[in-house]
């Protein structure tokens, strides 16, 4: 408890500005060189705590266009006979027909959920006829949409320009809002059209119908004195409110998971930039507390209270393995996903010795978005002994941490540091890991391509830590074959250039004049250029192979302080555009303005 009291005292002194600061130097937050651009837009025009804006005016969301029935020549068949579907049933049939041939349509859960929801949209007489998905034939529907997609690819330049102009007009009308007198870009002004839910991993609700969102489902948020957005003709909004403590412009509840969806500002907006900056500053502040927190939970492994022991072991997993705390679910929710606090005995196996290590814990469970988390990791002996204790006399379905809840853990984290959550730990460890990996992997003398490979390898370590997986892209094999073909062709060019250089060197040795010297230099430069191109292709192939099942983007955009990457780019003379796309650079404009080459997290 002494450490907890010290942490509370330190937090209070920090709020009062009484904690002595170390001298500003390389790698210390607060250094002027690492905090350049203090007059940035996201630091100006501050409101009191909780207030996000004074003025918010916008046009509301853009709704998906109404369904256009299929042409008469495109038919649906049941038991080999054409069946004329009602408009509602036909629309849902097109959702499945579009996906014909996709892996999803081979999954039993997807097929079952789709068919159940589709039958709900059918007329009574249609349900009496269509009783089995196996007897349905969507071939003509599928071919119709394949042909439409092919036709779009061969549009004339004029037709493509017209479509571009229409999209730009839509962007101008719905894609911007006025926030405190400034025009700000909106992130996702289009409401998602109806379709079939896919989910990530083996989601139990895959195939269910995502219903069409209507204006009557949508809550509008804007300032009281602004012009309220006009709903589409013949409709009205569910509600119009003025809540300046939130940053969303419109909200509705989607039909599959009953989760709330929002129209938000673009990530490059002032408010989003400020929120991101504060998020990473909170994680960065953890650096001053983390050693004491770790000492505390290690001491708590020996606590007399079972609740305290369980909390300490859970916090160790959150810290070391970047596990999510796990949100409590409503009774009856279909997806059996868990986090650290809701782990069951069946999700953990203990091995006294495995893989040449002692005290190994094997995790196997479905995490967020039904992504499987599997890991075998050696742990400290007291953690292993405590896990044995927690599992005594429990069945497979019993909670591992039966004295712990997400709520109680979060309350404890707040006591350790103001603003501390499991996600802050995750962000802190992800960012620290990236910084350490970049320091270990990057060599100043490497080529740009080799440095980028080092960066992606560092990013990959973080993605694995955070369990950011993806399925191998369906185009992977083909793209790798194309890349290997390019590499082979480049090798042949290098061999030919090397032979030409040898001949040029022999001619210069024989003639010794200026002309032969010029030819020799030209051949040498050509060989160097081709060798560099070959090296870049080889690095690209290695990078593609290593990351085929790892999603680098999730951690890069959400858990890694962008100032680390920008500082690395500046320090090693790597163009920032090699790491961040144009859209991402706009998103992290605040970091580009703040981070010098000596910034450290």
UniProtKB/Swiss-Prot annotation:
Its Gene Ontology cellular component terms are: chromosome; mitochondrial nucleoid; nucleus
Cofactor requirements of the protein:
Ca(2+); Mg(2+)
Query: Residue limits of the Topo IB-type catalytic domain?
Result: 268-601
Region entry Disordered: which residue ranges?
A: 22-48
| Positions of the UniProt region annotated as Interaction with DNA | 261-262, 324-329, 421-423
Which cell locations does it reside in? Mitochondrion
Sorted alphabetically, which SMART domains does this protein's record hold? TOPEUc
**Documented EC number(s):** 5.6.2.1
Q: Where is this site: Interaction with DNA?
A: 152, 200, 248, 279, 337, 368, 410, 468, 486
Q: Which UniProt keywords apply?
A: DNA-binding, Isomerase, Mitochondrion, Topoisomerase, Transit peptide
Describe how the cofactor binds: Divalent metal ions (calcium or magnesium).
Catalysis: reaction(s): ATP-independent breakage of single-stranded DNA, followed by passage and rejoining
What positions does the transit peptide occupy in this chain? 1-50
- Cite the active-site annotation: 559 (o-(3'-phospho-dna)-tyrosine intermediate)
Q: Which superkingdom? A: Eukaryota
Q: Name one Pfam family in it.
A: Topoisom_I_N
Q: Which PANTHER family match?
A: DNA TOPOISOMERASE I (PTHR10290), DNA TOPOISOMERASE I, MITOCHONDRIAL (PTHR10290:SF1)
- Homology family: Belongs to the type IB topoisomerase family.
- What is the protein name given in its UniProt record? DNA topoisomerase I, mitochondrial
Instruction: Tell me which species this is from.
Output: Pan troglodytes
**Taxonomy of the source species:** Eukaryota, Metazoa, Chordata, Craniata, Vertebrata
């Amino acid at each position: 408890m002494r450490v907890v009291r010290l942490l509370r005292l330190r937090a209070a002194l920090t709020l009062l500005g009484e904690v002595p600061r170390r001298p500003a130097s390389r790698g210390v937050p607060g250094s002027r060189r690492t905090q350049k651009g203090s007059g940035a837009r996201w630091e100006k025009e501050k409101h009191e705590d909780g207030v996000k804006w004074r003025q918010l005016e916008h046009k509301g969301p853009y709704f998906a266009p109404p369904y256009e029935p299929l042409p008469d020549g495109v038919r649906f068949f049941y038991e080999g006979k054409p069946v004329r579907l009602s408009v509602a049933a036909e629309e849902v049939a097109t959702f499945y027909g579009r996906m014909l041939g996709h892996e999803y349509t081979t999954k039993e859960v997807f097929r079952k959920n789709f068919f159940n929801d589709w039958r709900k949209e059918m007329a009574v007489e249609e349900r009496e006829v269509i009783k089995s998905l196996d007897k349905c034939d969507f071939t003509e529907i599928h071919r119709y949409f394949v042909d439409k997609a092919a036709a779009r690819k061969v549009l004339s330049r004029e037709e493509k320009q017209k479509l571009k102009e229409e999209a730009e007009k839509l962007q101008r009308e719905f894609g911007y809002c006025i926030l405190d007198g400034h025009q700000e870009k909106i992130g996702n002004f289009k409401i998602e059209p109806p379709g079939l839910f896919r989910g990530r991993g083996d989601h139990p609700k895959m195939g269910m119908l995502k219903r069409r969102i209507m204006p009557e489902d949508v809550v509008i948020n804007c300032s009281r004195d602004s012009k309220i957005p006009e709903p589409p003709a013949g409709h009205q909004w569910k509600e119009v409110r003025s809540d300046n403590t939130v940053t969303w412009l419109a909200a509705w509840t989607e039909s599959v998971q009953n989760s709330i969806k929002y129209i938000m500002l673009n990530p490059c907006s002032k408010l989003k930039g400020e929120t991101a900056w504060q998020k990473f500053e909170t994680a960065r502040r953890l650096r001053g507390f983390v050693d004491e927190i770790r000492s505390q939970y290690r001491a708590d492994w020996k606590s007399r209270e079972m609740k305290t022991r369980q909390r300490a072991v859970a916090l160790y997993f959150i810290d070391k393995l970047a596990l999510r705390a796990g949100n409590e679910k409503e009774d009856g929710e279909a997806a059996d996903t868990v986090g650290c606090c809701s782990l069951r005995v069946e999700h953990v196996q203990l091995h006294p010795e495995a893989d040449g290590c002692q005290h190994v814990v094997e995790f196997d469970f479905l995490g967020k978005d039904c992504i499987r988390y599997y890991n075998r990791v050696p742990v400290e002996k007291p953690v292993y002994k405590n896990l044995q204790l927690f599992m005594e006399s429990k069945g497979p379905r019993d909670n591992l941490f039966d004295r712990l809840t997400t709520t109680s853990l979060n309350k404890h984290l707040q006591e350790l540091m103001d603003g501390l959550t499991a996600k802050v730990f995750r962000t802190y460890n992800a960012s620290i890991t990236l910084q350490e990996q970049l320091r270990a992997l990057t060599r100043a003398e490497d080529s740009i391509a080799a440095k980028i490979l080092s960066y992606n390898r560092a990013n990959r370590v973080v993605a694995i830590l955070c369990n950011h997986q993806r399925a191998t892209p369906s185009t992977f094999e083909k793209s790798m074959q194309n890349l290997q073909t390019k590499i082979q062709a480049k090798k042949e060019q290098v061999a030919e250039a090397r032979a030409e250089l040898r001949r040029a060197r022999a001619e210069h040795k024989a003639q010794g004049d200026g002309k032969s010297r010029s030819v020799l230099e030209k051949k040498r430069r050509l060989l160097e250029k081709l060798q560099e191109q070959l090296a870049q292709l080889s690095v690209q192939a290695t990078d593609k192979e290593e990351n085929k099942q790892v999603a680098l983007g999730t951690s890069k955009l959400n858990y890694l302080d962008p100032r680390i990457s920008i500082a690395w780019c500046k320090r090693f003379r790597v163009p920032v555009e090699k790491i961040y796309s144009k859209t991402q650079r706009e998103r992290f404009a605040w970091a580009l303005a703040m981070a010098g080459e000596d910034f450290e997290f």
